[in-house]
Amino acid sequence: MEDTKESNVKTFCSKNILAILGFSSIIAVIALLAVGLTQNKALPENVKYGIVLDAGSSHTSLYIYKWPAEKENDTGVVHQVEECRVKGPGISKFVQKVNEIGIYLTDCMERAREVIPRSQHQETPVYLGATAGMRLLRMESEELADRVLDVVERSLSNYPFDFQGARIITGQEEGAYGWITINYLLGKFSQKTRWFSIVPYETNNQETFGALDLGGASTQVTFVPQNQTIESPDNALQFRLYGKDYNVYTHSFLCYGKDQALWQKLAKDIQVASNEILRDPCFHPGYKKVVNVSDLYKTPCTKRFEMTLPFQQFEIQGIGNYQQCHQSILELFNTSYCPYSQCAFNGIFLPPLQGDFGAFSAFYFVMKFLNLTSEKVSQEKVTEMMKKFCAQPWEEIKTSYAGVKEKYLSEYCFSGTYILSLLLQGYHFTADSWEHIHFIGKIQGSDAGWTLGYMLNLTNMIPAEQPLSTPLSHSTYVFLMVLFSLVLFTVAIIGLLIFHKPSYFWKDMV
């Protein structure tokens, strides 16, 4: 009788527990399969594109950017897929031939059509930002500047993209967007967290790089000063990016891009020339070039040196002397007046330099040509190499660099000397802080410059607050799924083992 009772209890318990375990196991298996299939289902590529045209003083470049749509608020996900340099000068040179602007832009806009899938054309934003060349034109005539921009807008509106307008950006904007670009690409705005720690850590002790930009008509310096009040409100910008506040110093020196600085130097030096011959230390020995006086005074940058000369043309004759060239350039910087605790030049406030700087655009292109972009090259070594380069005869230079256009080749002595003068005497870098200047062309395949920062700002892809993210990474998620599956499997095994316990186990339950 007792054996029968024990058998009935065992049978009853076995059936019920097995039913529960079996049902739970089936549900768990179905759930795991469903999650696994859903998680690993191949998804179509969901990307977005953006186009920015950099209408500079000497030329226009078109940049195409691409990013995954679902990650557009993450740091560093936007990358450059194409750069197209428009053939010809900057748009400010089309004042007297605005009807040619459409043809001027055609090749690069057609290239954009080819690169971006047709299905994406209508939702791809196009922005054109004009910089110092157009700022100078607007100083001469706002009407002429508006006419050029109107024709540019009409031309770009004819393409199947989402044209967002053309405008002249301020020097302050140009500096700020360049700063945003290099720090975005370097990942300086992101903050990583260790899996086993609730304390965040930075990839680098210095949170941001400073930005040094040199164009044809202006130069910008932008950085976050450490423990220093920005004494001039016009040079102060506040950003809140990814949940962190940045107090940024920026200034754009109009007329101090390398091309306009050369025009300034020539206009200054010709004032003291005894005749129509200008012996110039910033050009190689043996170099000669005739310059029209009318061309010299075309730009607003030379107005302060304008005077009536007894000749219509003058000839530059190079003598190739770095030290004399350097001294001539320094005369462009007024350091006698400073209404603040310290200044760069021309009475412009400049806080103490802090940390690393990325130097791009013409800073990079000139130094790369001179083979001086290596971080191991000291400032003293750069100066010595510039002395030797400038002293080389023009005929020898032409032979050594036969593939370079003479217009550009002839100006590298001046440009290299100007960069040294600007960085050392203009911005007050020293031999020690020179080592913190990084001459940058591209970062992870994207050009260093203001265009990416401009697009990121206008498309609101840099949020003020850190975007929300899933609490677990994909690998952690998979690990936990496997772990819980093993736990479920172990419980099932234990349950089965229970039913194989000796008979006295079941007696105790009765």
From Swiss-Prot:
<dbReference type="GO" id="GO:0043273">
    <property type="term" value="F:CTPase activity"/>
</dbReference>
<feature type="active site" description="Proton acceptor">
    <location>
        <position position="174"/>
    </location>
</feature>
<keyword id="KW-0225">Disease variant</keyword>
<keyword id="KW-1133">Transmembrane helix</keyword>
<keyword id="KW-0547">Nucleotide-binding</keyword>
<feature type="lipid moiety-binding region" description="S-palmitoyl cysteine">
    <location>
        <position position="13"/>
    </location>
</feature>
<feature type="disulfide bond">
    <location>
        <begin position="338"/>
        <end position="343"/>
    </location>
</feature>
<protein>
    <recommendedName>
        <fullName>Ectonucleoside triphosphate diphosphohydrolase 1</fullName>
        <ecNumber>3.6.1.5</ecNumber>
    </recommendedName>
</protein>
<dbReference type="GO" id="GO:0007596">
    <property type="term" value="P:blood coagulation"/>
</dbReference>
<dbReference type="GO" id="GO:0017110">
    <property type="term" value="F:nucleoside diphosphate phosphatase activity"/>
</dbReference>
<feature type="glycosylation site" description="N-linked (GlcNAc...) asparagine">
    <location>
        <position position="292"/>
    </location>
</feature>
<keyword id="KW-0812">Transmembrane</keyword>
<dbReference type="Pfam" id="PF01150">
    <property type="entry name" value="GDA1_CD39"/>
</dbReference>
<dbReference type="GO" id="GO:0016020">
    <property type="term" value="C:membrane"/>
</dbReference>
<dbReference type="GO" id="GO:0070062">
    <property type="term" value="C:extracellular exosome"/>
</dbReference>
<dbReference type="GO" id="GO:0005604">
    <property type="term" value="C:basement membrane"/>
</dbReference>
<dbReference type="GO" id="GO:0009897">
    <property type="term" value="C:external side of plasma membrane"/>
</dbReference>
<dbReference type="GO" id="GO:0070527">
    <property type="term" value="P:platelet aggregation"/>
</dbReference>
<feature type="topological domain" description="Extracellular">
    <location>
        <begin position="38"/>
        <end position="478"/>
    </location>
</feature>
<keyword id="KW-0378">Hydrolase</keyword>
<dbReference type="GO" id="GO:0036384">
    <property type="term" value="F:CDP phosphatase activity"/>
</dbReference>
<feature type="topological domain" description="Cytoplasmic">
    <location>
        <begin position="1"/>
        <end position="16"/>
    </location>
</feature>
<comment type="similarity">
    <text>Belongs to the GDA1/CD39 NTPase family.</text>
</comment>
<feature type="glycosylation site" description="N-linked (GlcNAc...) asparagine">
    <location>
        <position position="371"/>
    </location>
</feature>
<dbReference type="GO" id="GO:0005524">
    <property type="term" value="F:ATP binding"/>
</dbReference>
<feature type="transmembrane region" description="Helical">
    <location>
        <begin position="479"/>
        <end position="499"/>
    </location>
</feature>
<keyword id="KW-0890">Hereditary spastic paraplegia</keyword>
<keyword id="KW-0449">Lipoprotein</keyword>
<keyword id="KW-0325">Glycoprotein</keyword>
<dbReference type="GO" id="GO:1990003">
    <property type="term" value="F:IDP phosphatase activity"/>
</dbReference>
<dbReference type="GO" id="GO:0009134">
    <property type="term" value="P:nucleoside diphosphate catabolic process"/>
</dbReference>
<dbReference type="GO" id="GO:0043262">
    <property type="term" value="F:ADP phosphatase activity"/>
</dbReference>
<keyword id="KW-1015">Disulfide bond</keyword>
<comment type="function">
    <text>Catalyzes the hydrolysis of both di- and triphosphate nucleotides (NDPs and NTPs) and hydrolyze NTPs to nucleotide monophosphates (NMPs) in two distinct successive phosphate-releasing steps, with NDPs as intermediates and participates in the regulation of extracellular levels of nucleotides. By hydrolyzing proinflammatory ATP and platelet-activating ADP to AMP, it blocks platelet aggregation and supports blood flow.</text>
</comment>
<keyword id="KW-0460">Magnesium</keyword>
<dbReference type="GO" id="GO:0103023">
    <property type="term" value="F:ITPase activity"/>
</dbReference>
<dbReference type="GO" id="GO:0003924">
    <property type="term" value="F:GTPase activity"/>
</dbReference>
<feature type="disulfide bond">
    <location>
        <begin position="84"/>
        <end position="108"/>
    </location>
</feature>
<comment type="subunit">
    <text>Homodimer; disulfide-linked.</text>
</comment>
<dbReference type="GO" id="GO:0005886">
    <property type="term" value="C:plasma membrane"/>
</dbReference>
<feature type="topological domain" description="Cytoplasmic">
    <location>
        <begin position="500"/>
        <end position="510"/>
    </location>
</feature>
<keyword id="KW-0564">Palmitate</keyword>
